[in-house]
Curated annotation (Swiss-Prot):
This protein's UniProt keywords: Aspartyl protease, Cell membrane, Hydrolase, Membrane, Protease, Transmembrane, Transmembrane helix
Subcellular location: Cell membrane
InterPro entries: Peptidase_A8 (IPR001872)
Organism lineage: Bacteria, Bacillati, Bacillota, Bacilli, Bacillales
Active site annotation, chain numbering: D111, D129
Molecular functions (GO terms): aspartic-type endopeptidase activity
Protein name in the entry: Lipoprotein signal peptidase
Physiological role: This protein specifically catalyzes the removal of signal peptides from prolipoproteins.
Presence of the UniProt keyword Hydrolase in the record: yes
Catalytic activity: Release of signal peptides from bacterial membrane prolipoproteins. Hydrolyzes -Xaa-Yaa-Zaa-|-(S,diacylglyceryl)Cys-, in which Xaa is hydrophobic (preferably Leu), and Yaa (Ala or Ser) and Zaa (Gly or Ala) have small, neutral side chains
Membrane topology field: Multi-pass membrane protein
Amino acid sequence: MYYYLITLAVIALDQLTKWIVVQNMEIGQKIEVIPGFLYWTSYRNDGAAWSILEGHMWFFYLITVIVIGIIIYIMQKYAKGKRLFSISLAFILGGAIGNFIDRILHQEVVDFVQTVWGNYYFPIFNVADAALSVGVVLMLVYVFVDDRKTKGIK
């Protein structure tokens, strides 16, 4: 059940960082953290990643509730004893709930992490988005490693 602690930690860190941004920054304000690479940029997003489906909150409520239910079911039924699998699900669950809290309370998500690679500005994101991404990468690693074990590949 340690994976639920990971989920709670992700939610707490996500909500704390968003609260700090809302309390201390104006929308659109940018603070340079690492020159030419990392900025805190206060932004609100009423869509999904990269502002996909902006303005369709009902869709996000429905999908998020379904995803949260499925993840909790899978964690309870299949994750026990599978460390990497359960950790990946914990990150995904924490990220989903973190952004869901914003959508329920504010009908938008607070984003603030902005990275720049040369002339490319990566879309602004938050801790929940990062947790979702980490969870998906860990899940892919788990699937790849588990597949290799199943097939007996070293």
